[in-house]
């Protein structure tokens, strides 16, 4: 089939959603499909357009499998909601125009959120080409922004929720990462509708998890080049690797480091990555000898970064685990390392940690429980080894990149068949 993809990030951008979509696109190509990817110019790492990519609103690349159109993302401070809304509006407008004006007629359109605005953009592109739309939800917005206090005011929140419902209902299918997120979206998509219409809307929501590449991410030596480069040899390493944003309770990591600096001087807390919250965290950390900030590493080093930890942490602020499933969770399991998750009880993240036997789940923003869990893992190397091995065994049965692409392929085929469209006519 010919597929149009609207997404906020794509290779070589290093955003987690960009890595996910790039690999799924690769799998689509391997299956013989052609793609037109409409995305942003690379900007995630520096929160600004990368050197060499500036100076143009739209940049088009031809490939042997189709085309990539990159449009300006208009990056702004995440905490400045009005400016960010305008930025999303600018990016979405450009993406819509580029997607709608392409000569190739897509057989299906795949749009990714966040940003939520790509849902209506996908609807416009799909509607003009009489193609079905699949709306993929990585994080549920505006829930995340509301929980973080980034979106305030009853009218603003009501408007955002109206846009959310409209986007879900306008799609032919909505894909989410977990049962928690499916329940969340089904409740909203059916709200206020008659029984029959509500059931039809709920039936559109499908669970297709993000993949984990267990062939690329494998258990490795702790004392590797990463540890050598950042002077971690001989230390017990507590690692956070990922986006340093406001969704994560990384102040909990700073507090844990403060509590252990004297009693456990060989324990070093590493925050590997960049993001809007990092400057504030660095100020809070001061000159603590047991905290290291490391810039985001090239994607090729991910297995090495993950292997360097004795224990990983996945801290989410209260309420956020109901609307977000960090992809890093499955990468940690693939690396064969134990983890401590500070998340809401009963959520997908907490259930996965317990079900896999791969670590400890504690309540969010509870420093006492968090520190106790870390020490429990660090002080019992044999148990930590068992947890890591159990996580690896668990994730080996998880969705591979090929399996996730196959699930989407089946969904596209179902929707195209239902619409009566012949893919060969495009």
List PLM regions with ranges:
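Carbohydrate-associated surface elements
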Residues: 41, 180, 211
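Nucleotide-sugar-dependent
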Residues: 248, 296-307, 312-333, 339-351
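A short helix/loop element that forms part of the nucleotide-sugar donor recognition site in Leloir-type
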Residues: 51-58, 190-195, 218-231
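Membrane-proximal helix-turn-helix segments that form the acceptor-binding/catalytic region
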Residues: 100, 117-120, 124-128, 154-176
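N-terminal subdomain of nucleotide-sugar transferases
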Residues: 1-62, 260, 402, 425
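Nucleotide-activated donor-binding/catalytic signature segment of Leloir-type glycosyltransferases, i.e.
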Residues: 264, 278-303
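Conserved donor-binding/catalytic core segment of Leloir-type glycosyltransferases
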Residues: 212, 232-248, 254-258, 270
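A charged, aromatic-enriched C-terminal amphipathic alpha-helix characteristic of glycosyltransferases
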Residues: 365, 369, 379-412
């Amino acid at each position: 089939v010919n597929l149009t993809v609207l997404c906020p990030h794509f290779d070589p951008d290093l955003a987690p959603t960009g890595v996910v979509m790039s690999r799924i696109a690769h799998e689509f190509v391997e299956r013989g499909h052609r793609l037109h990817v409409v995305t942003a110019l690379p900007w995630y790492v520096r929160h600004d357009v990368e050197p060499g990519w500036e100076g143009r609103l739209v940049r088009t690349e031809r490939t042997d499998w189709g085309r990539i159109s990159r449009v300006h993302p208009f990056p702004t401070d995440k905490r400045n909601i009005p400016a960010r809304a305008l930025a999303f509006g600018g990016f979405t407008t450009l993406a819509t125009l580029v997607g709608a004006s392409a000569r190739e007629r897509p057989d299906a359109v795949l749009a990714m959120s966040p940003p939520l605005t790509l849902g209506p953009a996908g609807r416009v592109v799909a509607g003009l080409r009489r193609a079905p739309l699949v709306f993929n939800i990585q994080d549920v917005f505006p829930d995340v922004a509301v929980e973080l206090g980034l979106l305030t005011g009853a009218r603003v929140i009501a408007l955002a929720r109206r846009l959310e419902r409209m986007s879900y209902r306008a799609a032919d299918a909505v894909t989410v990462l977990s049962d928690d997120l499916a329940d969340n979206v089904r409740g909203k998509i059916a709200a206020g509708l008659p029984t029959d219409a509500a059931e039809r809307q709920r039936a559109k929501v499908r669970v297709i998890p993000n993949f984990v590449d267990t062939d690329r991410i494998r258990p490795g030596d702790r004392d590797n080049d990463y540890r050598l480069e950042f002077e971690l040899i001989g230390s017990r390493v507590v690692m956070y690797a990922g986006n340093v944003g406001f969704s994560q309770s990384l102040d909990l990591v700073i507090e844990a480091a403060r509590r252990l600096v004297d009693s456990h001087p060989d324990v070093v807390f590493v925050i590997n990555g960049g993001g809007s919250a990092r400057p504030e965290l660095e100020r809070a950390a001061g000159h603590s000898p047991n905290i290291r900030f490391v810039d985001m590493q090239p994607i090729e080093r991910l297995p090495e970064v993950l292997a360097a930890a004795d224990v990983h942490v996945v801290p989410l602020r209260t309420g956020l685990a109901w609307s977000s499933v960090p992809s890093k969770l499955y990468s940690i399991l693939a690396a064969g390392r134990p983890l401590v998750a500070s998340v809401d009880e009963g959520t997908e993240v907490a259930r996965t940690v317990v079900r896999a036997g791969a670590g400890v789940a504690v309540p969010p923003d509870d420093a006492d429980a968090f520190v106790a869990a870390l020490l429990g893992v660090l002080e019992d190397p044999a148990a930590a080894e068992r947890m890591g091995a159990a996580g690896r065994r668990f994730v080996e049965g998880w969705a591979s990149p090929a399996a996730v692409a196959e699930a989407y392929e089946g969904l596209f085929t179902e929707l195209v068949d239902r619409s009566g469209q012949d893919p060969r006519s495009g």
